[in-house]
Amino acid sequence: MGKEDLYTTRKVILYIATSLDGFIADSKGGIDWLHANAIERETDTSYEDFYSNVDTVIMGRTTYDQVTEVLSPNEYPYADSQSYVLTSRQTDNTKDITFTNKSVVDIVTDLKKQPGRDIFIVGGASIIKPLVEENLIDEYQLAIIPTLLGEGIPLLSDIKGNLKLTATQAKVVNNIVYHTYVKN
């Protein structure tokens, strides 16, 4: 497989949970509602299956802070991947985490030219929107939580352009509906 083949096979994947009414966080940025309707009937390996093909993660600073301070304060869950955190705040890089003020479009465009495995777009909404508008997301994996928030941070808002996707999978596991879409 040549370098050009790797460019075409490395996918940019948005893997994210959303409420039934399309919010990725409540009006205060909280995500406690994610587990409110959890029903553990069977082993759900959806995330593990997805993440096993990832070597790069991209997120905004707010998402990074939520991951490191609330969700997993004792252990960075993406330590086995190269992380890019988009921020205007000056922060020292570590071996596996690059803090940058580059545009997410430039970062993804550069990464797609490099050999590697899939690129995981963690969030948040301000990171997702320009990637959608530039049609840089190859696959959308949405976990729909059966909760109506009524207000909050929307997954997609005021997107410019028209993007057609193809549904490739839908499944229900433990009261969560997983939808997968790929760009045409």
What are these regions (language model features)?
Residues 2-184:
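Enzymes that bind and transform nitrogen-containing heteroaromatic metabolites
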